[in-house]
Amino acid sequence: MTQDSALLKAPEQTLRDGSNSRKVFIKTYGCQMNVYDSTRMSDALARDGYEPTEDMEEADLVLLNTCHIREKAAEKVYSALGRLREMKKKKAADGREMMIGVAGCVAQAEGEEILRRAPAVDVVIGPQTYHRLPEALRRAKEGQRVVDTEYAIEDKFEHLPVAESRKIRARGVTAFLTVQEGCDKFCTFCVVPYTRGSEVSRPVSQIVEEAEKLVEGGVREITLLGQNVNAWHGAGPRGEAWSLGDLLYRLAEIPGLARLRYTTSHPRDMDDRLIAAHRDLRALMPYLHLPVQSGSDRILKAMNRRHTAAEYLSLIERIRAVRPDIALSGDFITGFPGETDKDFEDTLRLVEEVRYAQAFSFKYSTRPGTPGAELKDQVPEEIKAERLERLQALLLKQQQEFAESCIGKEIDLLLEKPGRMPGQLIGRSPWLQSVNVDAKASQIGDIIKVRITGTGTNSLFAERAEAAV
């Protein structure tokens, strides 16, 4: 579930006392859930009159929403905070105030240490308490240095405002919606259970209400998010037990919601109902991100994945049997402690058998506090890097082959945003690819029939199907 740093902005709103709005700059690192969290923090800040800026220099509040998955994540944050300290000092000399906040998983993991190492920081707030951000800022303005990383007893989503339709519309025709947080799997390489906590599922009514609000605001495609999204569970209208598949069936009933996706999944939680949803729901896109991490049973056991390579392959076979056009994505780690050449070759064999449309791969990075950090037989960095290079070459080859296999196909394309060229829009294919096509800006949000004509580095090209020769 990875994404490069992104900027998200709070919606516009004037202060309750009628004075000029304050400016907020939010920088988001990491996964899609952090992107979603930044959006919800923006909505919460809007109630206190914070409006967006893309210029950090003019911000009254700079908020870093951080990620802790990779090695040196914290050091990158401290480096950014060093630059912000100088900016804050310069503004103070000019008689201007700037507050600095750190949110997200580094905030959760580091807590008070952030205030010790970065004295310019005013607020540190965790991913389970960001609904209390406005109050934390008020306390900071009174001179307190605030750390709020305790797991909240109350449901944060009940305390967060939902944006108005006009603000949702300004954000685009696709949206994220968090339905589940935390993880109970305790893979030995992963910090998520320690930074996001145990698995928690949002109630059906809350999810449906938010989805309906998004659709009212012009959203055509919703991606359901969770650290382990297919572990979501809840109660149906008669109190019956629901799993993610049931939730997808319910959301597919919302008028105007054309497309559904979900990420990130664990193989152990792909149940029959969810597989049936892939078979039955036209709105559920034929794309599945299903991380496996390794093709070696020995390494999978050391990772505490609790499934074998054969079980993963069998699951893929079952899914493809009901949805032959589904495209697979995955995550892989090279150089996990104890990984031998044979273990790595097992991973390559699994990749060859699955044939991914795209995948994400990383060198193993030691995360303090995880069981993996205590394992012996740590793999040398040069071997990790060499294996990663080989794996990525294979995955890139498969991605290119999948893209080329799309040439000549007619597909339904959701038009999302302007392209780089005049008269061009960028749309999203059912398989999550960016597709360039000539279309009018007024068509953003439409789903049109196109024919794929070619491939680019990270995108496809298409023409309107009715205009195709």
From Swiss-Prot:
It comes from the Bacteria. Its main location: cytoplasm. Residues 22-142 form the MTTase N-terminal domain. [4Fe-4S] cluster 1 binds at C31, C67, C105. It catalyses: N(6)-dimethylallyladenosine(37) in tRNA + (sulfur carrier)-SH + AH2 + 2 S-adenosyl-L-methionine = 2-methylsulfanyl-N(6)-dimethylallyladenosine(37) in tRNA + (sulfur carrier)-H + 5'-deoxyadenosine + L-methionine + A + S-adenosyl-L-homocysteine + 2 H(+). Its cofactor is [4Fe-4S] cluster. It is an enzyme of class 2 (transferase). This is tRNA-2-methylthio-N(6)-dimethylallyladenosine synthase.
